[in-house]
Amino acid sequence: MKYSNALIIILLSVIVCCNSGKKNPDQHTPNIILIIGDDHGYPYFGFMGSEHVHTPNMDTLANSGVLFTNGYVPDNHCRPTLQSLVTGMLPIDYKNKLNSIRAEKRNTLEYLSLDTESKTNWEKEFDYHGLRYFETMPGQLQKKGYKSFQTGKWWEYHYKYGGFTDGMTQGWVREKRNGMNWFQQFMGGEGTQIGRISNQPVYDFIIKNKQDPFFIWYAPQLPHYPFDSPQKYRDIYKDKGYSRSAVEYYANCSWFDNVLGEFIQFLKVRDLFDNTLFIYVNDNGWEQEPDQEFINDPMRSHNGGDKGKLSIYDVSFRTPIIFSWKDHIKSGIRRTDLVHSTDIPATILDIIGLDKEIDHFGNSIKDMILGKGNGNRTRIIGNSNKIRDDKDPMGRDVEAYWIREQNWFFNWNITDNKQSLYDIENDPYCNNDEIINNPEIALRLKDAITKWRKEKIRS
């Protein structure tokens, strides 16, 4: 009997030791994958009602969790939106803080000791190096033991600036910044190969770090230009009577959908899917209806229709936002609450038990996701400093604002002294300006923007 008891104790010790090395899934430390569509207009998903675009994997993801159909990003092009996702700050607040940091750095001995040419280069490149002075969501996740990986679009020079522990974007050499493919380097360098070339870098990271909770910034340059999808995706839209530019854009949408499906299947095969929180958001909008032809239009072939990217219409800012986590978030839920993309980092931090930073604009929507509450946001206001220009695909500088409240969308281009009002419940593509018929509504929304502007603008 004495020997039997001793044997039991030894066996129990072995079991405890073996189990102690395993990190069991914990409801507070899920793996997190933030999926960011690049120039993916909200109408061009099956789950958003499109009869033209084939997106079966995104449809499955949307139906597996909570879909917010009235999500909004803060700006009409990618970089400000991506900055807001990683910091939780509005672009206008990010810019204000960056300018304050810039002013402080100009008074340091390090800056003052530079020669004139070096100071000029410092000024030109400070914006690309500025994020390293900010608190970021990946940096905060490290406090909970997360390993994080940046892949895809990333304008902020190096993945380390975002607080990631690993990544694909590793900066550029100043002397080569005006050479071949310089724009591709600015957008993320090798990071932009994810999905288009292979998902292998992110697979390798996950295999290496699967014993730790991980966060993935998954932002393929899709369906973004160039529209060079493999033929099998173009064949989906063959002989349907769509314009050539529609076929090319829709094919890129399906390409994005397929590489995401491959990523999800990779997680399922390795038993990592169940404890992974998936989040989806676009970086900005796009317009490409089946009968719109932009193939011979240099500006619109790169930026889509006039109501999408680099515009100040609803389509440019609106995005579906998805949260999916098996057995934790109820599936098949569609909500029409107004949700802001900066709510995403606040919600991620809340789910894993961390407080958001004081300068975060967004609020946690965890209770809404879990079905325990309703949204309290009655309006969303944003600004844009770029707008369409027939001479420059990057747009021209303006001061412009927009607001969504209930079924109304109002925009105000201060630079060009233009404003318009749309009933997007009945006119989602903003074709019929209602400002003459509803002047009191336009004035009220304009007053709300004016108040917001005074709070945000620094002289």
Q: Predicted segment positions?
A:
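Formylglycine-dependent sulfatase
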Residues: 2-4, 11, 18-420, 428-454, ...
